[in-house]
Swiss-Prot record:
GO molecular function: metal ion binding; transcription coregulator activity
Biased amino acid composition, Polar residues: 1-17
Entry's Gene Ontology BP terms: cell differentiation; gastrulation; mesoderm development; negative regulation of neuron differentiation; nervous system development; positive regulation of transcription by RNA polymerase II
Protein name (database record): LIM domain transcription factor LMO4.1
Domain of life according to the entry: Eukaryota
Gene3D superfamilies listed in its UniProt record: Cysteine Rich Protein
Keyword tRNA processing (UniProt): no
Species: Xenopus tropicalis (Western clawed frog)
Length: 167
């Protein structure tokens, strides 16, 4: 099964400090170089962490890379291949692939559009919210039926983090 989830990973150049050599996630060889890269919770030779499309060495072109469908991609190739992340469920406008988003019940929102249907306050990562019949409610404005147990929310969420960039 191919994983279609997108992950943005920070690429960090670290010194090997003379410790035991690490194995490269790309070629499997020991990393004896003075500097190595740490990305996606693995160690890499600087020459081995490359974009699957353009073959650019990712440590040389920035500090982040994206993984999707088994590919490791630079930002430009990710945007070229996967374009936008769809339309915002609140405003209907397109969401660029590089923009952070919030999700609820399969719906995608711009960060600025992820607001309570009653008070219109923006909900941020860590806020509790309720998703009822396609509407988002903050903890304070949740429908009264939820308090008495008469209404079943489609989703009543614990604190939520924003999705990784894109998707």
């Amino acid at each position: 099964m191919v994983n279609n989830r997108v992950t943005e990973s920070t690429t960090t150049a670290v010194s090997s400090n003379g410790g035991p050599p690490k194995a490269c996630a790309g070629c499997g060889g020991k990393i004896a170089d003075r500097f190595l890269l740490y990305s996606m919770e693995r160690y890499w030779h600087t020459r081995c962490l490359k974009c699957s499309c353009c073959q650019a060495q990712l440590g040389e072109i920035g500090t982040s890379c994206y993984t999707k469908s088994g590919m490791i991609l630079c930002r430009n190739d990710y945007i070229r291949l996967f374009g936008s992340s769809g339309a915002c469920s609140a405003c209907g406008q397109s969401i660029p692939a590089s923009e952070m988003v919030m999700r609820a019940q399969g719906s995608v929102y711009h960060l600025k559009c992820f607001t309570c249907a009653t008070c219109r306050n923006r909900l941020v990562p860590g806020d509790r919210f309720h998703y009822v019949n396609g509407a988002i409610f903050c903890e304070h404005d949740r429908p009264t039926g939820l308090l008495s147990g008469h209404l079943n929310p489609l989703q009543s969420n614990p604190p939520m983090l924003p999705d990784q960039k894109v998707c």
